[in-house]
Amino acid sequence: MNASANLCAASDNDPQPGDQEAAHPVACAGDEPAAFLPHDLPIFLVGMMGAGKTTIGRGLARALRREFIDLDHELEARCGVRVPVIFEIEGEAGFRRREAAALQECTQRRQIILATGGGAVLAAENRQALRERGIVIYLRASVEELFRRTSRDRNRPLLATADPRATLRELMVAREPLYNEVADLVIDTGSMPIATLVKSLLPKLQAYEKK
């Protein structure tokens, strides 16, 4: 059996730690009363690695009492291995195929907050699904801020280069037009506290009408 087959075989019965948290509504005792939206459209977060999609997504899910899904965690649960291992065994092309399949399924769910991977917008079919099926929020941050947030993270295969800052800059140049293409809302994350950022997002989501 080859490496790819081993990767597939693990997908059904070897979930990773943290998958349960990513697959259920995020709510804690003592939380403020839930905010409500006038629709059940899913909310999709896009942006570069380190933009805060997972952290902000959890905050939104808590505020709205919605299910939170991290697309990378979803892939890890299906494959039974971490994202860097998928890259190592199947390369970026193999990872993107798996990512696209998971995204197509997840974007059909209602009342979710979905944090996508930084490169999920590269495929045209992914961009179409994001645009047509929910509200897309582009979480924007500068290259310097992204570098500061990701510099100690060893689970970023695309940043395993001699100059991660330059790599981030190149990725930003290639991807930012695609983020803007799909975005219904653009939010600069900067150094704003997560709770403050989430609170500022809620009225925008309540007022937004998908065209």
UniProtKB/Swiss-Prot annotation:
Catalytic reactions on record: shikimate + ATP = 3-phosphoshikimate + ADP + H(+)
Amino acids binding Mg(2+): T54
Cofactor(s), names only, from the UniProt record: Mg(2+)
InterPro entries in alphabetical order: P-loop_NTPase, Shikimate/glucono_kinase, Shikimate_kinase/TSH1, Shikimate_kinase_CS
HAMAP family in alphabetical order: Shikimate_kinase
Subunit structure: Monomer.
Name of the protein in question: Shikimate kinase
Species lineage: Bacteria, Pseudomonadati, Pseudomonadota, Betaproteobacteria, Burkholderiales
